[in-house]
Curated annotation (Swiss-Prot):
Localization in the cell: Cytoplasm, P-body; Cytoplasm, Cytoplasmic ribonucleoprotein granule; Cytoplasm, Stress granule; Nucleus
Key words of the record: Acetylation, ATP-binding, Cytoplasm, Helicase, Hydrolase, Nucleotide-binding, Nucleus, Phosphoprotein, RNA-binding, RNA-mediated gene silencing, Ubl conjugation
Gene3D superfamilies registered for this protein in UniProt: P-loop containing nucleotide triphosphate hydrolases
Reaction(s) the record says it catalyses: ATP + H2O = ADP + phosphate + H(+)
Subunit structure, as described in the record: Interacts with DICER1, AGO2, TARBP2, EIF6 and RPL7A (60S ribosome subunit); they form a large RNA-induced silencing complex (RISC). Interacts with APOBEC3G in an RNA-dependent manner. Interacts with TRIM71 (via NHL repeats) in an RNA-dependent manner. Interacts with both protein products of LIRE1, ORF1p and ORF2p. Interacts with TUT4 and, to a lesser extent, TUT7; the interactions are RNA-dependent. Interacts with AGO2, TNRC6B and UPF1; the interactions are direct and RNA-dependent.
PTM-bearing positions, type Phosphothreonine: 160, 254
Region of interest (Disordered), ranges: 968-1003
Family: Belongs to the DNA2/NAM7 helicase family. SDE3 subfamily.
Region (Interaction with AGO2 and APOBEC3G) location: 921-965
Native species: Bos taurus
Location of N6-acetyllysine modifications: 148
Biased composition annotated in UniProt, kind: Basic and acidic residues: 976-985
Binding site for ATP: 524-531
Protein name: Putative helicase MOV-10
Amino acid sequence: MPSKFSCRQLRETGQRFENFLVDRGQDRETDRERLRTIYNQDFKTSFGTPAPGFSSMLYGMKIANLAYVTKTRVRFFGLDRWADVWFPEKRRMKPGLEMSKHHRSLLATIFHDRAEYMHGKHGVNVEVQGPHEARDGQLLIRLDLNRKEVLTLRLRNGGTQPVTLTHLFPFCRTPQFSFCNGDRELPCLLGPGECYELHVHCKTSFVGYFPATVLWELLGPGEPGSEGAGTFYIARFLAAVAHSPLAAQLKPTTPFKRTQVSRNPVVTRRIEEGERPDRAKNYDLEFSLPLGTYYPPPRLRQLLPVLLRGTSIFTAPKEIAEIKAQLQTTLKWRNYEVKLRLLLHLEELQMEHDIRHYDLESVPMTWDPIDRNPRLLTLEVPGVAESRPSVLRGDHLFALLSSETHHEDPVTYKGFVHKVELDRVKLSFSTSLLSRFVDGLTFKVNFTFNRQPLRVQHRALELTGRWPLEPMLFPVASRGVPLLPSDVKLKLYDRSLESNPEQLQAMKHIVMGTTRPAPYIIFGPPGTGKTVTLVEAIKQVVKHLPKAHILACAPSNSGADLLCQRLRVHLPSSIYRLLAPSRDIHLVPEDIKPCCNWDAKKGDFVFPSKKKLQEYRVLITTLITASRLVSAQFPIDHFTHIFIDEAGHAMEPESLVAIAGLMEVKEADNPGGQLVLAGDPRQLGPVLRCPLTQKHGLGYSLLERLLTFNALYKKGPDGYNPQFITKLLRNYRSHPTILDVPNRLYYDGELQACADVVDRERFCRWEGLPRQDFPIIFHGVMGKDEREGNSPSFFNPEEAATVTSYLKQLLAPSSKKGKARLSPRSVGVISPYRKQVEKIRYCITKLDKQLRGLDDIKDLKVGSVEEFQGQERSVILISTVRSSQSFVQLDLDFNLGFLKNPKRFNVAVTRAKALLIVVGNPLLLGHDPDWKVFLEFCKENGGYTGCPFPAKLDLQQGQNLLQGLSKLSPSTSGLKSHDYLPQEREGEEGLSLQVEPEWRNEL
């Protein structure tokens, strides 16, 4: 029966009830049943007029975003102050030996408090005999290959009273160690001066780092219950190491020391600005729609540290509870703007924190040798060529003279970037600084990031409220209005699509336009030709719809350039590529320069008027540059079609930049424009830095949100509804073997291997394969992940050396001197950690004589998974890097962090066309379900080599281990337990710094 109360009345009643609770001092009550009792017995009797039922009132408060409601709890507050997001995905259960949280905590205690376990107690200590080095709390045994070393660990009672050795636990999962403790059975009594020997045998046929831990459990002196009696523990941490010569050269140069983020930015009360690059020149595109600043609320900045602590919604202070509730509420149209705005603010606050890690102390600047107006200073910025940090023309940074850092009121100099050359930036500063400048003057430098992408995303969210976009962003149906007759014949520009029914189907539905106002999605798994399909659809729209005007976008410049290159073949005079003025013209492909806004005669970018741009049938931009068309207020009905390639890479607000203000949904007989999204939700999404935005949904692209949560795009018993979505099935890139695992894991086994047979089988007979005709190698390496200097990023010397060895085999010169059998351009090396990327590059360009001597070795790309998305190579090598420093870390619920990501795994293994080589720690990777499937696939098909493949832990051995460790409780050991692993957390801020993703440089 419908409620007799309106939503407004329900909301007003709820607000009066909330005030009623405040007046009675009961506003902290969250139990739903107790609140029901208060409402029915106390509040309703004092209400004065008929009041709605308790559940109806809660419903009114919930839909008004004024309460967070579960089956048992209720919390009242104003959600619209901050905004809310959707529930995080359920975490995967981890495979392997089932250990309770208690047991994991006890094992973690061993490693985390290892200094405590290494101390002798009651006069009992461990003597070590045999070849070893004591380093960082470990006994390091250096091994030559296939030569045995024996270490004796002698537990000696040096006290005055007897003790009892009750248990001995050797923790090791690798065959490099074997333990022998003689014939003495446990428990055994050790009188004063007596000892118990454990012989540790070490031998390996493989290079690597092999950890083990030995734990002795003893019963202290004295009668049970007397002073001094009780269980105590002593441990020793071992590591057998066999290095290759190359790995020995890659050891840490300096000990790792965590960087302290500067709390004292250089911006002071007095700021003097340099001269900005002249961007108004050649600019005829009128800006008539203002762009706000959209800074994060100051109060949100203050609350962020508390927000990150993980307090419960029902016990947190009210402001914190409000935000937390919003971060756990489903995304709906009614909260769309405020929710996504909150997430953007949180991401920006994390960016502000992360950018401080690039600040420089006491760095010199020099005069730019080229005499120009204005005079520029040159600053060396390591990493800027790789956008770490991103510095573009027009950006700014702050500099403070090193000699004035302790002055009471120093001047901060704001320098504007005029030019970027590799790792050098050229800056304009105020004339007062230039008048006193001499070469070599040193500065403290603070970097900033370009807020333009954030600002235009905020404006796009604002514009969603001005234009009726709900039927497009939260579609429920198609209006079924076609743009062309159903019997129209389409003559294809690319005849290859005729033999691909999925590509043909997608293209026809897009041209017909019957999906409107809902977006059409091209779901394109790796190598299936989604961009080819999208480009053909654009060409057909131009051909068959004479009044159509198209905006074609991608998140990246490379993606937009590719669209331009492929469209230009048949539409040379109909397209125009609009580049941002910060783009380095040297990076723009030569073949698209004639149809972009670069004026070669002027040597500068030009921006034609709105009237001129409207004459082109197709405009091509990045998503962010599309904001210039919004600022120019193109007519809302000018663009009939908006195509977004790589749509899965973009945050939803970023996709909105090219939609809100440029397209609307109209009445039923004219559904308005057609939005087309092409991408793959199973591959990497947007790169985010903030743990809260990662957890609560900003990582969802518009494409992935629709595919995941909207019924129109769900897969049914007969597949997807072709009126709204087409999944491409024919892979034109990879050998079937390389495609096998990702196909089964992520694409329901539907992908068909259609790559050219000659190309894909190029390495099936390569002598380096463990098994012929199986072009995948998993090379097991038990390495050690290291860090050095102030970089939190990990590297693994042994893996880097192994990768280098494979590269030498692959690129070995043929009979022609200096000419490689395989071009370095055809090879890619992927590693998730920035420091490992640096080490591998160092190996191939500096350390290895054979590789560094190749003329084109610099064409061999080494980079992160993100840097390879959308790319392919004949050969891909992957170094996974992470390993372990102790058995405890290795065998527990190890935090794989950056590796434990199905999308990242999928992208990494699907870049290869003909040969895939993975170098990593099989024992560690086997804890992840996807890596485990891949490992077993390699093992079963003969593609595994390297260190022995780990056997499964015997179930009874595991039970005995747990039973013994159950005695390791804090109450008996006197040591505190830990609910976390000793491994440094890889969520929150730590992960983004270890991986060090590129900073955005696409405008």
